[in-house]
Amino acid sequence: MTQNLQMADRFDSSAVEQALYKHWEEQGYFKPTENPSLPSYCIAIPPPNVTGSLHMGHAFQQTLMDTLIRFNRMEGNNTLWQTGTDHAGIATQMVVERKIAAEEGKTRHDYGREAFINKIWDWKAYSGGTISQQMRRLGNSIDWDRERFTMDEGLSNAVKEVFVRLHEEGLIYRGKRLVNWDPKLHTAISDLEVENKESKGSLWHFRYPLANGAKTADGKDYLVVATTRPETVLGDTAVAVHPEDERYQSLIGKTVVLPLANREIPIVADEYVDREFGTGVVKITPAHDFNDYEVGKRHGLPMVNVMTMNADIRAEAEIIGTDGKPLTTYEAKIPADYQGLERFAARKKVVADFEALGLLDEIKPHDLKVPYGDRGGVPIEPMLTDQWYVSVKPLAEVATKAVEDGEIQFVPKQYENLYFSWMRDIQDWCISRQLWWGHRIPAWYDEAGNVYVARSEEEVRQKHNLPADLALRQDEDVLDTWFSSGLWTFSTLGWPEQTKELKMFHPTDVLITGFDIIFFWVARMIMFTMHFVKDENGKPQVPFKTVYVTGLIRDEQGQKMSKSKGNVLDPIDMIDGISLEDLLEKRTGNMMQPQLAEKIAKATRKEFENGIAAHGTDALRFTLAALASNGRDINWDMKRLEGYRNFCNKLWNASRFVLTNDKLDLSAGEVEYSLADRWIESKFNRTVGEFREALSQYRFDLAANAIYDFTWNEFCDWYLELTKPVFANGTEAQKRGASQTLVRVLEKLLRLAHPIMPFITEEIWQKVKGFAGIDADTIMLQPFPKVVKSELDESAEMQIGWIKELIIAVRNIRAESNIAPSKGLEFLVRNVSDEQRKILAENDRLLKAMAKLDSVQVLSADENAPLSVAKLVGNVEVLIPMAGFINKEAELARLTKEIEKMRGEITRIENKLGNEAFVAKAPEAVIAKEREKMQEYQNGLEKLQTQYQAIENL
C-alpha cells in the first residue's frame, strides 16, 4: 500500500505558530498532572520586570528553560514551569511617574500615595501583559493559570510572614547606617542599581595644619591630605595614615585643625590607607564614604552628616555615634555661607576657600569611577539614613555550606568561587526603600516613637494589647524588590501554607540566570529558602539543585546591547521580521540627543540595509541553543540565524520528500532492511545518546549541534539519497524496508528536535503520525527517544562510512577536473582488503547509483591502470580514468590564471594587514573579516594547486 499527502513547498512559520500555541494552551498540555507518584521536574522562571518587554537575554534564557521543560515532560516527569513577573519597585514607579508627568503635568504627590498606587495598578492591568504575550510567541510551554506577580495577595502574605519571623528572631532591625542614596529619586538603592562611570577628575591636595605645635619629620607644620571630594570636608572627623608609614609614625594620636570648620580632629593609623595614593594621608569622613564609615567604626569616630536628602549642604550638621544614635557631646558647626549650597557648588567653594587661605597645595588630574544611580542618572551620595536591615551572616553560613557540600551546584563551576567570595564577606542588607510602589514594611509607630512589627495593624493591637484609640502610623517605606524576589521559588507554590504544590515541586530543579545577579538574587533565594522551608525531617531545603549561569548576548561586534548604543535587537523582530523604517523608528524614536540618533541610524542602515527578514521562532530558538556555550558571552550572529532558518526548511523539505513520495510503501508484507537502513537507525541512536549526554551537562550547544549534524549531514544529505536507488530498482521487500525506516526515523527525529524547535516539529509530526501508526494528539506528550542498544550497528556504520568516503573521493575528482555530475565514470580501486572487496561486491549497485559510475573494478596490486586521477581513501587508492574528459593543456592554462589571481588577492590582504596604521585604526571586527578572507583565499589556492597537480600528473 502506498500513501502520501500534500505538503506546502516551504514551512510558513507565520501561518502556524500562533495557532499551534493557542491550541496547546487551550488543551492544557502545559499543565502539570495531579499524579503525585510521578517524578516531578520544576523550573521557576527569573521573573522579568512587569515594566519590560522581552529582550534577547530573556529569549536566550527562556529558550534553554523551555528546552529542559519540554524534554522532561516527554520523559514522563510531572513538569511545572512556574512563571510570573516582578513588580520592580523603582523601575515601575518611574515609568508611571513619567507617564503622568507627560500626559497630565502631575507628580505622584499631586495624587497622594493611595491614588498613585491605584494608578500603577491600572497601568499594570493595561500594559503588564506585554511580556507574557511575547513569551507565548517564543513557544514557552508555561502553565499560565499559575502565573504569579510579586505583589499578588498570596506573595504579599509570604513577604509579611518572612519579615515578621526574621524580626522576631532578631535578624531584622532598624538602624542608622550608610547607604547608596539617590538624591534625585530620594531613595536608598542597591549596589546593583549603581553604575560606576569612568570620569576625568581631580585629586586636590589640601594642607591641614597640625595642632599644638606638632611638626612632621621634615619640619612642616601641616599635613597634605589628598581627596577627590572636597565638598565633604566639613564632615571630616579624622585624617588617617598607614601604621607602617615612617613619614607619619610620630604624628599618630596627635591632631590637626580642620580648615573652614576650625575644629581639631585626630590623626589615626589604619591599614586601609594606601601609602602610594596622593601623599599617604587621607581624610576620614564616615558619614559620606563607605570605606571611611568602616574606618570610623574601627576607631570610634563620630559621623558628621553635612548633606540633606537633596545632597545640598545642611544648615546644621547631624552628628551620629558609632551605635547609630544621636551624639550630643560632639560639636560640628557648618559655616553660614555653605548652608544650602548644592554639593558641586560647595565643592567649588571649598577649593576656592582653601586657596584663599593658602592651604591649596596642588591639583592633579585623576581618573576615577563615579557611582551613578542607573535610573536617576545622577551621582549617588553615601548617606546616613534610618533604614531596615537584615542581619544576613547567620543565613549566609547555611547557604554557603549548601554549595560547599554539593547540595547546590553551579554550572560552570567557576561561579561557585564568585558566590563564595561574596558570601564570606557579606554585610547586613539594607532592605528599605523610600518609594511608594512595593511591599510596604509591616511596622507601625505610635506617637511616642515605639515600633511594632506584625502582619497587620489588627495583629499589632492584639499582640501588644493596644487600645483602639491609640493612633498608629505604618512605616512609609517599602521593601527592596530583591526581598520579595528572594522568596520566589516557594512563595509561588503557596508558602507559608503547606500546599500540595510545595510538597510536589520544591525544591525546584534548576535555575537559569545571569552571573550579574548571583549575589543580589541567587544568594538571597538560597538564604531565605533554607531558613524558612524544611523537608519532612526538618532539614533545610535548597531552592534549586543546580544554578546554570549564562553569559550575555552581545551584538555582532561584541558590544553590550543597550538603548543608548542603538544596538538592541528585539527577539520578536527576529521572528516576524521588521522593515528598515520601523527598525530605525524603534532605535531612534524619542531620543533626547539627535546627534546620537543620527549615528545610530547610520550604523543601522549599514547593518540592516533591507531591514530584518522573518525567520520564525524555531530558527531563533535553535540559534540561541546552538550559541549557548558554557558561561561565555555570546556575540549575536545574523548569519547563524539565517543558517538555522535554512535548517528548518531543510527539515521541512526532507519531510516532504518522505511524505509525498508516491513510491512510499507501508503495506503489510515481507520487509528487508538494507545496510543503509541499519546504518541510519544506528546513527540516530548515537545522536540520541549525544543529545541526552549534552543536555545532562547543560551543553545546549552540543545538543543542538547533534541534531543539526544528524539531520543535515546524515539523514538529508545521505540517507534520503541512499533510498533513491532502492525505490528505483529494489525488491518490494526492500522498498518496504526503506519506507518504514524513512517514516520511523523521521518521526523519532521530530521528537528528538521538539524541545528546541517546538512549532515545526509539531506541524510535521501531525502529518507523520498517521504514516507511523500513532494515534495521539500532540508530539509534546510523546516519549522522548531513548538509546536502543540493539539498533546500534558498528558494522553498518563502518561499511556505509567507507562507501561514503569512496563517493566523496569520486565527487571531489569530478569537481577538481570539471567533469559534469551526470557524466558516467569508470571506477577503479587498488589495495583493498578482502572485507572491503566483499563490501564493494554487496553494494555495487548502490555505489554506481550514488557516484554516477558506469563500472566498478578492483585492480590487483601489480595491475597497471590507464591514465587516471587518483585519490587515497585510507590505504585504498581510488582511480578515475581521464581519457576523453579534458584538454590537458587548456585546463592547465585556465588553472594557472586562477592561481595567479588568487595569489594577487592574498598579497593584497597581506599588505593591508602588514600596514601598522591600518591595524591600529581599524575596528577589531574589520581586521577579523580581512583575516577570514585571507584564510578563504589560502584554502582556495590550496585547492587550485591540488587540482593543477592532479591534471599535470595525467
From Swiss-Prot:
Name the residue ranges of motif: 'HIGH' region.
Answer: 48-58
UniProt keyword list: Aminoacyl-tRNA synthetase, ATP-binding, Coiled coil, Cytoplasm, Ligase, Nucleotide-binding, Protein biosynthesis
Residues bound to ATP: K563
> What is catalysed by this protein?
tRNA(Val) + L-valine + ATP = L-valyl-tRNA(Val) + AMP + diphosphate
| GO molecular function annotation | aminoacyl-tRNA deacylase activity; ATP binding; valine-tRNA ligase activity
* Keyword Disulfide bond included in the entry's annotation: no
Q: 'KMSKS' region: where is this motif?
A: 560-564
EC main group:
ligase
Family annotation (InterPro entries): aa-tRNA-synth_I_CS (IPR001412), aa-tRNA-synth_Ia (IPR002300), Anticodon_Ia_Val (IPR033705), M/V/L/I-tRNA-synth_anticd-bd (IPR013155), Rossmann-like_a/b/a_fold (IPR014729), tRNA-bd_arm (IPR010978), tRNAsynth_Ia_anticodon-bd (IPR009080), Val-tRNA_synth_C_sf (IPR037118)
List where in the cell it is found. Answer: Cytoplasm
Major place of residence = cytoplasm
Q: Where, if anywhere, are coiled coils annotated?
A: 883-954
Electron transport in keyword set:
no
Question: Known EC number(s)?
Answer: 6.1.1.9
In which family does this protein belong, per the annotation?
Belongs to the class-I aminoacyl-tRNA synthetase family. ValS type 1 subfamily.
Q: What PANTHER family does this protein map onto?
A: VALINE--TRNA LIGASE, CHLOROPLASTIC_MITOCHONDRIAL 2, VALYL-TRNA SYNTHETASES
* Entry's free-text remark on domains: ValRS has two distinct active sites: one for aminoacylation and one for editing. The misactivated threonine is translocated from the active site to the editing site.
- Entry function: Catalyzes the attachment of valine to tRNA(Val). As ValRS can inadvertently accommodate and process structurally similar amino acids such as threonine, to avoid such errors, it has a 'posttransfer' editing activity that hydrolyzes mischarged Thr-tRNA(Val) in a tRNA-dependent manner.
The protein depicted here goes by the name Valine--tRNA ligase
Task: Say which species the protein is native to.
Answer: Actinobacillus pleuropneumoniae serotype 5b (strain L20)
